[in-house]
Amino acid sequence: MKKFKYILLLAVLFALGACQRSQEERMAVLKVYNWADYIDEDVLAEFPEWYKEQTGEDIEVIYQTFDINEVMRTKIERGHEDFDVVCPSEYIIERMMRKDMLLPINREFGETPDYIPNLAPYIQDELNKMSQGDKQVTDYAVAYMWGTAGILYNTELVTEEEALECANLWNKKFSNKVLMKDSYRDCYGLAIIYANKDRIEKGEV
């Protein structure tokens, strides 16, 4: 069963609180929170120069990474740190919108054209299914990339038939030989699919 996961780029509503930087200093900083290895280091290094060409202003980029969606959301929700741009999966965006944790995207920036309307209608429709009330998701998030959760296996040790059978993840033959992605959603999803395998095969769910 294929599961598509969108990674989205969005603006985060942050509470300044007792921050150490003045508001003016904070405006000269772009804080990005993303998955590891998603943006080339050369892009991060070149961004300040591009930004100055667009606006005439200097900018400092602070780039932090996370490996679990829930860790990212908790860090922001509890006000441990503020970010301007974060890149969570789509279900986290839906939860953040419910709690008014997001700011609309500024579409008028420097000399850069607004390419957001060129996004495929299908993708825009899919994103907007998560909209809350009169708030359209596409005003707060942009599709960044997508991925498919799957299973990797060593063909010298596992046959194709074994790899296609979800139950083999619990097979004693593979005990202590299986590694799983550290993702609550993927782990729960796999367990639920396995528990309802018969109903799925019968088309009941």
PLM region spans:
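C-terminal motif of bacterial Sec signal peptides marking the signal peptidase cleavage site
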Residues: A15-A18
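Extracytoplasmic ligand-binding site segments that recognize negatively charged/polar headgroups
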Residues: Y38-E41, Y91-V205
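Early extracytoplasmic/lumenal segment of secretory-pathway proteins
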Residues: S22-K99
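N-terminal hydrophobic targeting signals that begin at the initiator methionine
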Residues: M1-K2, Q20
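Intrinsically disordered low-complexity regions specifically enriched for long asparagine
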Residues: Q20-E25, K202-E204
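Sec-dependent signal peptide recognition
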Residues: K2-L9
